[in-house]
Amino acid sequence: MQLTELIETTVTGLGYELVDLERTGRGMLCIYIDQLAGISLEDCEKVTRQLQHVLTVENIDYERLEVSSPGLDRPLKKLADFERFAGSEVSVTLKKPLDGRKTYRGILHAPNGETIGLEFEGKKGEAAMLDFTLADIDKARLIPQVDFRSRK
């Protein structure tokens, strides 16, 4: 079983979603998890303990394991991510330029089949629509929406 598959099986078995996995050159393994209710420190501890056990049993070499939430600027990688965050502000970078540009920022529309829509501000300030597929994307992230005024 490959590392990604092993980790995804473990994480989903605990009731979480594997958002991303990074392995650095210094033996660090970074795992990003999420769930609809959000991620707490206890969730990260639970997944860390289980992964430490699984990685030891499977004899996977690593120096340090880090489990965390994907953060406010969470990456969007799967079609389910685009469905879940429809209506949110996102930044999308395409692999190839479209109309002379690769990076777009706008409001995500729910996917229609394999096609994902992004409403953005066009060249003359008017609303424009970009349609793309997962295969067109280099990277996509949520734009954090933070409101400090609501805190007392």
From Swiss-Prot:
Keywords: Cytoplasm, Ribosome biogenesis. One of its GO terms (biological process) is translation. InterPro entries: Ribosome_maturation_RimP (IPR003728), RimP_C (IPR028998), RimP_C_sf (IPR036847), RimP_N (IPR028989), RimP_N_sf (IPR035956). One of its GO terms (cellular component) is cytosol. Its main location: cytoplasm. The keyword Cytoplasm applies. The keyword Glycosyltransferase does not apply. It is found in: Cytoplasm. Pfam families: DUF150_C, RimP_N. PANTHER family: RIBOSOME MATURATION FACTOR RIMP. Belongs to the RimP family. Required for maturation of 30S ribosomal subunits. NCBIfam families: PRK00092.2-1. This is Ribosome maturation factor RimP. The gene is rimP.
